[in-house]
Every structure is written in C-alpha cells, then in structure tokens.
Regions:
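Short basic, glycine-rich beta-strand/loop surfaces that mediate nucleic-acid
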Residues: 145-189
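Extended interfacial segments that mediate partner engagement and assembly in macromolecular machines
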Residues: 57-131
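Short active-site oxyanion
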Residues: 48-49, 104-105, 122-125, 144-148, ...
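Positively charged, polar, low-complexity stretches
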Residues: 111, 138, 142-151
C-alpha cells in the first residue's frame, strides 16, 4: 500500500538514524513555545518539523542524546514520559479511525461476522487483538489470504470502538480509512514491538 503514496516530496530524514523514509513511516515533532518537544501526530502543528522513524528506541535515543535541541540549536526539554505519550496518542488515533469506520458502515466486528466477510471476498484491513487466543487468530488469518493484517491493539482497546469490554476481530473495508488505519497501526507497532 505504501508504494502507492510515496513521492519524492513525502520523504523525510530521521534525526537519529539519518535514514530517509516516507513520512508515513515516521513521526513529526515540533518544538513548542515553552521549548519542549511536542509530538505532532496529525502533522499540522506550525514550526519546523523534526522527523523520527516510528520506533520506540529511536525516540529514546533522540531524548537521551538531546537531538531535538541539537537540531534547533537551543535547549529543548523532553518529558520523561514522551515515549508513553506518543504511544497513547497513536493508540487513540487508531481507535478514532476504527470508530469512523464503524460510523461509516465500513467496519465488521466479531469472529463470525469477519469470517463471513472474508469468505465472501470482502477485503480491506484485518485488525486482530494482540492478546487474542493464538488458535483463533491463526484460523481467521488463514481465511485472510492476501488481506493485510495488523495485530497491534489489545482486545480492550478494540472493545472501546463498539463500547464492548473486549473485541478480538475486526475488518475494515477497502478504502481511504483502511489505508489511514494501516498507516497509524504501523506507526504504533514501532512503539509496541518487544
């Protein structure tokens, strides 16, 4: 999916690794008026953007080595909980996108409903709870041949989408919402991998 969106203008350089990636795989930060590093998940805040690969260890390194301050040539404060703040913001964004899919009728939730959609050829993005039972996840993944699968959010987080206590399986129909959700889940995965 990412190759469809990549153009020369969409690439940024990570301030930690120096690696050049598409901004869909990165996180933007700006320095606020109080000289603090502020995550810009929506990429809309004013100011010079400082880009990092969407990975926990890269943000840790940027904070530890004061790379935000070095890039803007002044003292920049980074909160101790910046990594957790970014993870929470990305998780919230993913849940919001799933709720938008639900409101627009593009979300199918529940194991039997998702299985039925997959067997009928409805494709999109399969979202599975990261803490779901391995046997059940394997069964549903086997039906999803050729369908992108993300397993980043917990069942409790997925449950928030429908007001349930838990949700393990969800399918977002092909479209812009599925593409945006895939991007955000990919960025969140960089903060949740072991």
């Amino acid at each position: 999916h990412l190759a469809e969106f990549c153009d020369a203008a969409g690439f940024r350089t990570c301030i930690v690794s120096g690696e050049r990636k598409h901004k869909f795989e990165m996180l933007r930060f700006v320095v606020g008026p109080d000289d603090r590093a502020v995550p810009d998940i929506e990429e809309k805040l004013p100011g010079r953007g400082l880009w990092l690969g969407a990975e926990r260890q890269l943000l840790d390194a940027a904070c530890k080595n004061n790379l935000f301050g070095k890039r803007v040539r002044r003292e920049v404060e980074t909160k101790n909980d910046l990594v957790f703040l970014v993870e929470a913001l990305l998780s919230k964004k993913c849940i919001e996108l799933l709720q938008m899919a639900r409101c627009s009728g593009a979300l199918t939730a529940g194991a039997s409903e998702v299985r039925e959609c997959l067997s009928c050829g409805v494709v999109g993005l399969l979202v599975l709870a990261s803490d779901g039972a391995p046997t059940g996840l394997r069964k549903i993944t086997a039906l999803a041949e050729g369908v992108p699968v993300r397993s980043v959010l917990t069942s409790d987080e997925l449950g928030l989408v429908l007001g349930r206590q838990r949700l393990v399986n969800a399918l977002v129909e092909t479209g812009r919402l599925a593409e945006r959700l895939d991007r955000e889940l990919g960025r969140l995965a960089g903060f949740r991998k072991d």
